[in-house]
């Protein structure tokens, strides 16, 4: 889910913290990618006649096709992706997961009704609401990445938290995800739309956390205390407090405790036994991979292994797989050239003194939405 309304709030309050970029500008960059978010995108978007792609055995293959071709696209642009997979969800997320289960049950009812009435538009809509990333999807994509020579990490808990830790440790340049809570976990740079379909022609949004804090005038702790009332995955919100009021209150009072002391609780009641302190603690000290043990390596693809898995087992076209391998090998030759700025320390911040380019497209529009050891795998 991420943080409700945070994208629009940042676009309104700190537009200078958002840059729109082309994928070619990330040549030579190592980027940590929220794998679950990608798989969800692929299962929603990679479809034929409104249905997920399947092989002759009835096995879903949308996630594999999406992972294969989108990863190759990044490699061809000189990007070095590392995928981060979710581990066990935190206990605080159980209420949110329960809500999602209820929504799925409702979507199943609506889908059955739409199928009975032959309403194709609603069939497509409710089918997408039932999309769920499974352990099998994850395991198959991990196998595919290993065969492609692309590293992945199994986070001990939330993938976005481990992505942020990798950025803060200097292992990668940015976190790529659509969930804005990557910022709440403290990633210095967050990229949106990096793994979106090329057909959508969405510019990549690059958000700089230090500039957001600077322009809004908040500390890291205050930003977290802003995000919790906006709505996150770990606890409820204060009734009747929207994004504009939330930012005014946090600027005025500095913390959730002080806000609760100073608002009219009869008009704006907080949830009973509100777990905001626990949510704050999770954002501040998330369970993440031990970054000192992470050694990222990108290697040559195992072409015959790919053919065995993707063609013999999953029934993909052998010509397309071999052509994909050629593209990976060619990209490895091109990516040996480094970035000039790799010789210098990169802080990931934007200077507020220089004039920012005028935003266009989605960033300009008012949007409606807004260390414990882990398991590390690399391409063999």
Swiss-Prot record:
GO cellular component: mitochondrion; nucleolus; nucleoplasm
Entry binding sites for DNA: 47, 70, 158, 231, 233
Cofactor(s) named in the record: Mg(2+)
Nucleus keyword on record: yes
Post-translational modification comment from the UniProt entry: Phosphorylated. Phosphorylation upon DNA damage induces relocalization to the nuclear plasma.
SMART domains, sorted: HhH2, XPGI, XPGN
GO biological process: base-excision repair; DNA replication, removal of RNA primer
Region annotated N-domain, chain positions: 1-104
Binding site for Mg(2+) 2: 179, 181, 233
Top-level class of the enzyme under EC nomenclature: hydrolase
Keyword Metal-binding: yes
Key words of the record: DNA damage, DNA repair, DNA replication, Endonuclease, Exonuclease, Hydrolase, Magnesium, Metal-binding, Mitochondrion, Nuclease, Nucleus, Phosphoprotein
Pfam families reported in the protein's UniProt record: XPG_I, XPG_N
Subcellular compartments: Nucleus, Nucleolus; Nucleus, Nucleoplasm; Mitochondrion
Reported function: Structure-specific nuclease with 5'-flap endonuclease and 5'-3' exonuclease activities involved in DNA replication and repair. During DNA replication, cleaves the 5'-overhanging flap structure that is generated by displacement synthesis when DNA polymerase encounters the 5'-end of a downstream Okazaki fragment. It enters the flap from the 5'-end and then tracks to cleave the flap base, leaving a nick for ligation. Also involved in the long patch base excision repair (LP-BER) pathway, by cleaving within the apurinic/apyrimidinic (AP) site-terminated flap.
PANTHER family per UniProt: FLAP ENDONUCLEASE 1, FLAP ENDONUCLEASE FAMILY MEMBER
Protein's UniProt name: Flap endonuclease 1
Protein's gene: fen1
């Amino acid at each position: 889910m991420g943080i409700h309304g945070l994208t629009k709030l940042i676009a309104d309050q700190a537009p200078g913290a958002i840059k729109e970029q082309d994928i070619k500008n990330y040549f030579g960059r190592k980027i940590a990618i929220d794998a679950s978010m990608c798989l969800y995108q692929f299962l929603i978007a990679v479809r034929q006649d409104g249905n997920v792609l399947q092989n002759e055995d009835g096995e879903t293959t949308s996630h594999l096709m999406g992972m294969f071709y989108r990863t190759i696209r990044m490699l061809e642009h000189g990007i070095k992706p590392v995928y981060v997979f979710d581990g066990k969800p935190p206990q605080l997320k159980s209420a949110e997961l329960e809500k999602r289960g209820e929504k799925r049950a409702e979507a199943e009812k609506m889908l059955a009704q739409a199928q009975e009435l032959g309403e194709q538009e609603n069939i497509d809509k409710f089918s997408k609401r039932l999309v769920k990333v499974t352990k099998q999807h994850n395991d198959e994509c991990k196998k595919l990445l290993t065969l492609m020579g692309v590293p992945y990490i199994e986070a001990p808990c939330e993938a976005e938290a481990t992505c942020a830790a990798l950025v803060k440790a200097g292992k990668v340049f940015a976190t790529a995800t659509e969930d804005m809570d990557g910022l709440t976990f403290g990633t210095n740079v967050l990229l949106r739309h990096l793994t979106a379909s090329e057909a959508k022609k969405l510019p990549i949004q690059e958000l700089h956390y230090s500039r957001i804090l600077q322009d809004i005038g908040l500390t890291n702790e205050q930003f977290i205390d802003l995000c919790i009332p906006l709505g996150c995955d770990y606890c409820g919100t204060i009734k009747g407090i929207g994004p504009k009021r939330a930012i005014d209150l946090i600027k005025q009072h500095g913390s959730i405790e002080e806000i609760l002391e100073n608002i009219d609780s009869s008009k704006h009641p907080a949830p009973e036994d509100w777990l905001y302190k626990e949510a704050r603690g999770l954002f501040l000290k998330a369970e993440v991979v031990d970054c000192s043990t992470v050694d990222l390596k990108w290697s040559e693809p195992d072409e015959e292994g790919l053919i065995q898995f993707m063609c013999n087992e999953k029934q993909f076209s052998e010509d397309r797989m071999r052509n994909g391998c050629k593209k990976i090998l060619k990209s490895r030759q091109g990516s040996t050239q480094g970035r000039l700025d790799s010789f210098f320390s990169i802080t990931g911040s934007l200077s507020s003194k220089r004039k920012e380019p005028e935003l266009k497209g989605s960033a300009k529009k008012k949007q409606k939405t807004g260390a414990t050891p882990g398991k590390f795998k690399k391409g063999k």
